[in-house]
Amino acid sequence: MNKTSRTLLSLGLLSAAMFGVSQQANAHGYVESPASRAYQCKLQLNTQCGSVQYEPQSVEGLKGFPQAGPADGHIASADKSTFFELDQQTPTRWNKLNLKTGPNSFTWKLTARHSTTSWRYFITKPNWDASQPLTRASFDLTPFCQFNDGGAIPAAQVTHQCNIPADRSGSHVILAVWDIADTANAFYQAIDVNLSK
């Protein structure tokens, strides 16, 4: 094989590898409505957010929550150090959206579609402490809403109808999780809400 052929072959392999990486890297999404903590950073309703304001679709970490996945204290950032600001937790740190308990729509915007295992929604316990970092102990560990996709490729916009538990009121965090079927990862979106009946 001559030098030109080797160079062309190397460039071809490099291009294929980069295409594969870019395809995986583009498989992202965020909760558009009610706007997640990360998306509200992009909208500048949340401030001092760091780099997540430019890429709310990239809050991605290991799947398997609550048995695996992000470490306690790093759940909102999906354990991604570049988005550490999302893990800051005080009663007044994040803009809260007013929602009512009962039926609500949750809409994901996918910047690229990806084979999906499930979509799951967790909520903080009635007695959670809003002044402490989010941990598994903060949440009911059984999702209040779940949709299984069995590996299907979703549309670019996905809306789920979910019933927020009636025994919640006031400040809460809803954790929306998009579990990817063909990678070890999931996308995590914290949604800050103020609930009433």
From Swiss-Prot:
The lineage of its organism: Bacteria, Pseudomonadati, Pseudomonadota, Gammaproteobacteria, Enterobacterales. Its cofactor is Cu(2+). InterPro entries: Cellulose/chitin-bd_N, GlcNAc_Chitin_IntDeg, Ig_E-set. Its EC number is 1.14.99.-. This is AA10 family lytic polysaccharide monooxygenase CBP21. Lytic polysaccharide monooxygenase (LPMO) that oxidatively cleaves alpha- and beta-chitin with C1 regioselectivity. Catalysis by LPMOs requires the reduction of the active-site copper from Cu(II) to Cu(I) by a reducing agent and H(2)O(2) or O(2) as a cosubstrate. The gene is CBP21. Residues 28-193 form the Chitin-binding type-4 domain. GO terms for biological process: chitin catabolic process; polysaccharide catabolic process. Belongs to the polysaccharide monooxygenase AA10 family. Changing Y54A: Decreases the binding to chitin. Disulfide bonds join C41-C49, C145-C162. It comes from Serratia marcescens. Residues 1-27 form the signal peptide. Its main location: secreted. PANTHER family: CHITIN-BINDING TYPE-4 DOMAIN-CONTAINING PROTEIN, GLCNAC-BINDING PROTEIN A. Binds 1 copper ion per subunit. Coiled coil: none annotated. It holds the Pfam family LPMO_10. Changing E60A: Decreases the binding to chitin. GO terms for cellular component: extracellular region.
